[in-house]
Amino acid sequence: MLRMRTAGWARGWCLGCCLLLPLSLSLAAAKQLLRYRLAEEGPADVRIGNVASDLGIVTGSGEVTFSLESGSEYLKIDNLTGELSTSERRIDREKLPQCQMIFDENECFLDFEVSVIGPSQSWVDLFEGQVIVLDINDNTPTFPSPVLTLTVEENRPVGTLYLLPTATDRDFGRNGIERYELLQEPGGGGSGGESRRAGAADSAPYPGGGGNGASGGGSGGSKRRLDASEGGGGTNPGGRSSVFELQVADTPDGEKQPQLIVKGALDREQRDSYELTLRVRDGGDPPRSSQAILRVLITDVNDNSPRFEKSVYEADLAENSAPGTPILQLRAADLDVGVNGQIEYVFGAATESVRRLLRLDETSGWLSVLHRIDREEVNQLRFTVMARDRGQPPKTDKATVVLNIKDENDNVPSIEIRKIGRIPLKDGVANVAEDVLVDTPIALVQVSDRDQGENGVVTCTVVGDVPFQLKPASDTEGDQNKKKYFLHTSTPLDYEATREFNVVIVAVDSGSPSLSSNNSLIVKVGDTNDNPPMFGQSVVEVYFPENNIPGERVATVLATDADSGKNAEIAYSLDSSVMGIFAIDPDSGDILVNTVLDREQTDRYEFKVNAKDKGIPVLQGSTTVIVQVADKNDNDPKFMQDVFTFYVKENLQPNSPVGMVTVMDADKGRNAEMSLYIEENNNIFSIENDTGTIYSTMSFDREHQTTYTFRVKAVDGGDPPRSATATVSLFVMDENDNAPTVTLPKNISYTLLPPSSNVRTVVATVLATDSDDGINADLNYSIVGGNPFKLFEIDPTSGVVSLVGKLTQKHYGLHRLVVQVNDSGQPSQSTTTLVHVFVNESVSNATAIDSQIARSLHIPLTQDIAGDPSYEISKQRLSIVIGVVAGIMTVILIILIVVMARYCRSKNKNGYEAGKKDHEDFFTPQQHDKSKKPKKDKKNKKSKQPLYSSIVTVEASKPNGQRYDSVNEKLSDSPSMGRYRSVNGGPGSPDLARHYKSSSPLPTVQLHPQSPTAGKKHQAVQDLPPANTFVGAGDNISIGSDHCSEYSCQTNNKYSKQMRLHPYITVFG
């Protein structure tokens, strides 16, 4: 549905369009004519139809496009969809030259041509079409003059008919004149303004002669009349009488002729004129109308009207006839005489073109040529001629004249060369790319001849040896006067061989003599962008120093292009990966650096440089640019740490690695080659330049010095050189090379424990020290022997010996507890000491206790000494004594017991002279000299002597007041006890080495750049120990070790009868 700008005009518009239905919607084997309907005077962008849909072409991919080759003055087409619509210029049917003399609705049309173009113009089809322009009611019918004058003789009989001037309407058909109306003048008497109409339904056949007498009605025609009342208050009793009536007749040429009929008597003496209103109305919707004053003058009698010999005159006229050439003579006769019989000829309802081209002699009726007539402009003239006498009033007759303009071969063929598809063509020059395919249409050639028949039959050809040929644009046989051809390429084009062709096209018609014409087209072969820019090298490598100034040129890359013009103009660009770092001049190819390069951050840049030409399509080439950033000595050497801390074990062999420092230089080459030095070198350490490993030149003694601190300097090889320093702290770690030393109790001392002591009574406290540090000095106490009754236990940490069992009669006597003290080193070192406990109420015989302690020093540690061994025997003897009442038996028994006791005691004394090398039934603990460690040599100045670490030390005074040397005095000569091992002991002699020596060796210490700092003392890496000091308690200190020596028995007469021991006794109770 079309939208009109005004409501009234829209109704006529819509009825005139009915909209835009194509008359041909399919394409059969041959191309058909596309026909559409369109109402005139429509706005822009009114849809007419879809060419693609009507041709059955699928659109949407963009590969097939449409182009309007002709008709673009009023029409336009969408290149992709094929939608045909109106352009900005309005279509006025009445102003179209081809519709001036057209009275058939289907004969007024606009021609157009549409080309359908395949992909890359590989094929082109041309289709013709017509848009039939439908008339709308846009013109108002008008009379020749606003006042029409008609002369009527008085006393004319009723029924006399007079022809009235006709109105003209530029529209036709139903929009043309439909009816005439006669309106009574207001105030003129009669019917007081009443109107009567004579229209299409009121019309009658046009009378043959059209006369104006009583018989003017002619024959065979029915009439509808409109009365005009005579006023003036005459004899008409009603004041009104009918005088005139309007009748409309249909003429042979299809027009409507208004006629005035006399209905009443006319008396000039009573009234000499009448003024009526004649209205004309067309058949449009809404209708248009206009009116004129019809002035009727009553005159004397003119009896007869002129009459033409024919109602229709038809003649042929050759075009281009010279002005003045007679065509035909119109003849009419009038029976009147005198002035009433004199006839003059005038044009009737004729168009302006008729009056411009023809001349009608008013007296003779000769029709002649006024101006040359061109058949190509007007092929037929149809008009009316009026014959009018000179009577008062004059009478008229009308005849139709039809002139057929005959053709002459007066037009040379016309050659029009237009663009087709996407090939540009302007001012007779077509630009064709060299890579077009053979048989590609490059232009549309239309050859036409305005002549008719053989004069308009045209043939066309291409002149000369050019790679082009003409092919018909349509497969159908169309109008021979108008032919269309495609100008195709016949061979490949080569820009390098020929860059321009002058194509001459000649057209010849078939007239006699024939006429010909020619037209030319310059075809310029365009260079195709078929060569990409090329670089001389696929990889360009440059070296550029760091710390540059932004904006410096790094390198220049150049590319060449074998094409020409825009196709050879090159623009350079860089990868987006280095945008901001580098830039390139798009014209010169100079690569510039935008920032300061730092080789230590990025030492190499690799990117692509693209060279693009400016052709269509754009082609490009590329090369890889590698920028190696050259180093400058702008970085100091850098140690991984400002302070390196290492831990090494004491007694490490000289020239052993003690640590490793790591230093780096962000520079490169000689700037990164470094030399390492130890500042303030005291010849204790050296450093390896390549690895940074630090070596010691001596063996470390933790007891001598625990830490070493020095500085390491690194100097690079730059010019000038750069340097850096770091501090190295070396901590000497302790080795478990000292066994625990027991300070209390002494081996010869004992503790008196009353039998009434309660459980958890503290019996004694074992105190020991260790010269080592850390976990090597963590001591653990344990009872390893002499506790068969489980009466005692020792706190493993504090060394406190407590009573844990109830003492009974059988527990009376001496108890020898073997206590072992172990450190926590790896491997562990240990020492063994003796704790003597005498269970009794009091010490009644100190000598006997001293004797028992002395004997216990020679008894193997595997043999328990706990309580009175003769307790059971004494109990039996007591039973015998109780049983024997007799005195003699008692005396005898006592004597025997005393004798046996003395005998046994004497025997035992001889047995305690152990210590001689030839007696191997038992052994005592002996400390072994540690001669392996050089640092302990100063402690071993005395000769090696057996040390009784497994016996009780008893302090006694010599008779002269000096302190008796005990067996344990030998221990002061050696700092630690050796490992226990069996020396040909007798049966039952213990192997203390098997029971008490440590097993696993120290783990291997790996050197690292920095030794880890130990946490707790039981970690794998020990904390640095304090100074290794040995704690002693005078000459009689018992020092034990986990190293066990051979047992040797040396009494040196220390336990002879002449000697009396005065032991220290601790008494509980």
From Swiss-Prot:
It is a single-pass type I membrane protein. It is found in: Cell membrane. The lineage of its organism: Eukaryota, Metazoa, Chordata, Craniata, Vertebrata. Residues 29-143, 144-308, 309-415, 424-535, 536-639, 640-742, 745-862 form the Cadherin domain. Residues 930-944 have a biased composition (Basic residues). The keyword Transmembrane applies. SMART domains: CA. Residues 1-28 form the signal peptide. This is Protocadherin-7.
